[in-house]
């Protein structure tokens, strides 16, 4: 038999803080109650529910504002990656979500895996790509990622003569 609960925190896939939800007894007993993410709903929890909903609304407004600011910042930023390629311009490996998060951190932008709706997203081709992001409070943003080949490999393919080689050729 399912139990009615008052959520104290947002629980993904179940509800948000202040919501009264039903959940299976094992989930309640083994996860929600021990981690203090919920309490069993009763007559005395109505005041707590009102307080939690008010706090959630304030937090949601702040999160939405913060997410919209971040979306505006991300609109103007291009993350650039230099990767090794073979002579046919095929990449060795790929640019993964972890690489994008690390590069964004260098620019003081905090992203997590939760911001990427496609968790196994990987860029395997050269060029500019638009990466969709999901921020807090259902705000979406697009991050531009530009992947280009390393200049050192291009130099190996098209070697520039050194000054010594140029001088030797002029003497001949």
UniProtKB/Swiss-Prot annotation:
Belongs to the bacterial ribosomal protein bL9 family. It comes from Chlamydia abortus (strain DSM 27085 / S26/3). Pfam families: Ribosomal_L9_C, Ribosomal_L9_N. This is Large ribosomal subunit protein bL9. Keywords: Ribonucleoprotein, Ribosomal protein, RNA-binding, rRNA-binding. InterPro entries: Ribosomal_bL9 (IPR000244), Ribosomal_bL9/RNase_H1_N (IPR009027), Ribosomal_bL9_bac/chp (IPR020594), Ribosomal_bL9_C (IPR020069), Ribosomal_bL9_C_sf (IPR036791), Ribosomal_bL9_N (IPR020070), Ribosomal_bL9_N_sf (IPR036935). The lineage of its organism: Bacteria, Pseudomonadati, Chlamydiota, Chlamydiia, Chlamydiales. Gene3D superfamilies: Ribosomal protein L9, C-terminal domain, Ribosomal protein L9, N-terminal domain. Signal peptide: none annotated. GO terms for molecular function: rRNA binding; structural constituent of ribosome. Binds to the 23S rRNA. The keyword Transferase does not apply. GO terms for cellular component: ribonucleoprotein complex; ribosome. GO terms for biological process: translation. Coiled coil: none annotated.
